[in-house]
Regions:
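Terminal, regulation- and interaction-focused segments at domain boundaries
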Residues: 2-12, 103-118
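Short beta-strand-to-loop capping motifs
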Residues: 6-8, 65-71, 109-113, 158-164
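N-terminal ordered "arm"
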Residues: 12-37
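A short, aromatic/hydrophobic, helix- or strand-capping loop or linear motif
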Residues: 35-42, 89-93, 128-134, 184-186
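Short, charge-patterned binding micro-sites
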Residues: 36-66
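Ordered, amphipathic secondary-structure segments that act as subunit-interaction surfaces
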Residues: 59-109
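Short amphipathic alpha-helices in soluble, non-transmembrane regions
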Residues: 74-83, 117-125, 172-174
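Core RNA-modification/binding signature centered on pseudouridine synthases
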Residues: 123-207
Length: 207
């Protein structure tokens, strides 16, 4: 099984996960990469993705698995067919369920003053409030925050749970901004993923 690491930046960060699946399928077809198809009445490419990210979050660490054989220049062939903001940057061979195994992600958060308040998320029983399906929800998310550190006054780095126990980084940012009266826009960049505490690229390179 091939595992490909790819980016979703600029306009590609505004593409929903289901449309990303369609885009990757199209890219594989255009690049003439021979991927196995599912059996049944509605066959589709056997692709598996790491946990999806919310719209507007840029990423340089997305992963997709494909039941395909290794080919020469496969990254170049794929990248020749990618839309702006999407590119394939690394290739691995490993049989793995990406969504279940890559269960943490690192993000760079950028917003006015967020570096000065990021330490707050490390408080015991840290609770955030957000709106879900028009209902205000409060949850203790402390068990899903693995690290948080200041980069400078206006940026910070966090490692959060993803996958089955996903914690959306935009909810952390918006809660901090609301609680601390921070104004302005914010930006989030996903920089890497982990299999527990092992960086994804290192894990996928292991025999």
């Amino acid at each position: 099984m091939l595992i490909l690491k790819f980016t979703k930046t600029e306009n590609s960060s505004l593409v929903a996960h289901v449309d990303t699946l369609r885009a990757v399928t199209y890219i594989f077809r255009r690049a003439k990469v021979d991927v196995e198809y599912s059996k049944g009445f509605n066959p589709h490419m056997e692709l598996g993705f790491s946990a999806p990210i919310s719209l507007g979050i840029e990423s340089v660490a997305e992963y997709v698995s494909a039941k395909a054989e290794m080919q020469d220049d496969i990254l170049a062939k794929l990248n020749a067919n990618c839309p702006k903001g999407m590119s394939f940057v690394a290739l691995f061979e490993k049989k793995v369920n990406l969504a279940a195994t890559l269960n943490r992600a690192e993000y760079i958060l950028t917003a006015n003053g967020i570096g000065n308040v990021i330490h707050q998320v490390l408080a015991p029983n840290y609770t955030i409030t957000y709106t879900e399906k028009r209902v205000e929800v409060s949850k203790d998310v402390s068990s899903r925050i693995f690290s948080a550190e200041k980069i400078d006054e206006n940026s910070a780095k966090v490692v959060l749970a993803c996958g089955n126990s996903n914690l959306r980084p935009d909810r952390i940012v918006l809660h901090l901004m609301t609680q601390n009266n921070l104004v302005g826009d914010y930006k989030i960049l996903k920089t890497q993923m982990f299999a527990d505490d092992i960086p994804a690229d290192e894990f996928l390179s292991q025999e």
